[in-house]
């Protein structure tokens, strides 16, 4: 049985890919393909099952992971994933597709661990990363943390992780082999017109099913007008400690109203020249 693993990283259209897989899950199953996950489509359990240290994040909180039960949860996730894979094999399916953007944050030791574990269960494994221009990815992150995490600074190019694409790809190539890495390009990062879902289908060898799968209409997290983002940021300034607690329903509704007040994103979020120069010096 073969496995295709989409690894993100974040802010590269993962929710769109997962929406496509979820919508077409039954049709894929009829064709011998399993969209594998435990609960939600983002499959964060897989990332935590092979992480080396506990980190308190929104994802870990949603899965009930604490510093006290961390090792117990890791083992539980591995057992549940292993059982699910065994069940898929027993059903006679020939291929598994996984979309887990959290895997994009794994370090070398963690990638080696998941590789060893996966190759005990699959004959062939292909890794699908999505590559996006660093400035576009940083702008997307800025809009996300203003809207959802109470970000205060008017700093458009947010690159807190100093993400290095070459290092990222080399990690996975060194462990899974260069021929098994099938990168695709995010549409806003290349001059030619591209379709993320069609490119994902090509990388995961689903193109032959394009006549029976629903391909269009899966773009999620549409671009938000820059004016809406700035209004949200200024509201955040009224409560500068909001990032310390989860966003409540009232704030979510307010941000939704602000976002919907601009029918089409005419104003883009753009960094200053100095901010752009400082950003590019890190790459």
Map each language-model feature to its residues.
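Anion-recognition interface
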Residues: 1-283
């Amino acid at each position: 049985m073969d496995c295709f693993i989409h690894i993100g990283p974040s802010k590269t259209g993962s929710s769109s890919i997962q929406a496509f897989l979820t919508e077409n899950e039954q049709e894929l199953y009829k064709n011998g393909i399993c969209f594998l996950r435990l609960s939600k489509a983002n499959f964060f359990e897989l990332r935590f099952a092979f992480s080396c240290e506990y980190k308190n994040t929104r994802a870990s909180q949603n899965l009930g992971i604490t510093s006290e039960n961390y090792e117990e949860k890791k083992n539980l996730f591995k057992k549940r994933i292993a059982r699910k894979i065994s069940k898929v094999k027993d059903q006679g399916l020939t291929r598994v597709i996984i979309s887990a953007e959290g895997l994009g944050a794994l370090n070398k030791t963690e990638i080696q661990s998941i590789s060893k574990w996966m190759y005990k269960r699959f004959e062939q494994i292909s890794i699908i990363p999505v590559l996006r221009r660093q400035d576009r990815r940083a702008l997307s992150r800025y809009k996300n943390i203003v809207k959802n995490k109470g970000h205060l600074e008017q700093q458009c190019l947010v690159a807190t992780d100093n993400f290095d694409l070459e290092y990222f790809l080399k990690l996975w190539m060194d462990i899974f082999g260069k021929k098994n890495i099938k990168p695709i390009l995010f549409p806003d990062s290349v001059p030619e017109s591209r379709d993320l879902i069609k490119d994902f289908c090509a990388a995961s060898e689903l193109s032959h099913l394009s006549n029976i799968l629903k391909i269009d209409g899966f773009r999620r997290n549409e671009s938000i007008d820059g004016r809406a983002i700035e209004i949200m940021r200024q509201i955040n300034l009224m409560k500068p400690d909001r990032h310390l607690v989860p966003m409540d329903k009232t704030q979510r509704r307010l941000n939704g109203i602000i976002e919907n007040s601009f029918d089409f994103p005419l104003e883009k979020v753009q960094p200053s020249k100095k901010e752009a120069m400082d950003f590019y010096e890190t790459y």
